[in-house]
A protein has these predicted regions:
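Short, well-ordered beta-strand segments in beta-rich or mixed alpha/beta enzyme
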Residues: 15-22, 51-81
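Glycine-rich beta-strand-turn "strand-cap" elements at beta-sheet edges
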Residues: 1-15, 22, 53-60, 88-109
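An amphipathic, aromatic/His-enriched active-site/gating alpha helix that lines ligand/cofactor pockets
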Residues: 37-41, 45-50, 68-102
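Intrinsically disordered, low-complexity acidic/polar segments
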Residues: 28-30, 74-76, 109
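Short acidic-aromatic low-complexity motifs
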Residues: 4, 25-26, 45-46
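Intrinsically disordered, low-complexity segments enriched in polar/charged residues with Gly/Pro
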Residues: 7-10, 27-29, 39-42, 53-56, ...
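Short, surface-exposed ligand-recognition loops at beta-strand->loop->(often short) alpha-helix junctions
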Residues: 22-35
Length: 109
């Protein structure tokens, strides 16, 4: 993933997606590598992608992905690509589950 700075716009626009993944320490590194690869090779090149950050807790049992998109439709279109369908199937084998939740920025402080 690129090292560009993730910024929350002062005027709430677009779509924020926060996805949490639950895994074991045994699969944490492989999961993070699969997510990094998905962002580097596919997601960052999709229409409407603004930026993202991956976070792992110190127990290596949870990953949180924060991503920003121009619109909800752009995010959904990325999920429907054959490449992401295949990658998400693989990612699901590395974790107990994952849950993307879509948010709109309500306030920036």
């Amino acid at each position: 993933m690129s090292q560009k700075s993730l910024q929350i716009p002062a005027v709430p626009t677009g779509q924020t997606v926060i996805t949490t993944f639950e895994m074991t320490p045994a699969t944490a590194t492989e999961l993070m590598e699969a997510l990094q690869s998905a962002f580097d090779e596919v997601i960052r090149h999709q229409v409407g992608f603004i930026g993202a950050a991956l976070h792992m807790n110190d127990a290596m049992t949870r990953v949180c992905n924060y991503s920003q998109w121009r619109s909800r439709d752009d995010y959904k279109a990325m999920l429907r690509t054959p490449e992401m369908i295949a990658r998400n199937r693989h990612i699901l084998t590395l974790c107990k589950g994952f849950e993307p939740v879509m948010y709109e920025v309500a306030r920036v402080v």
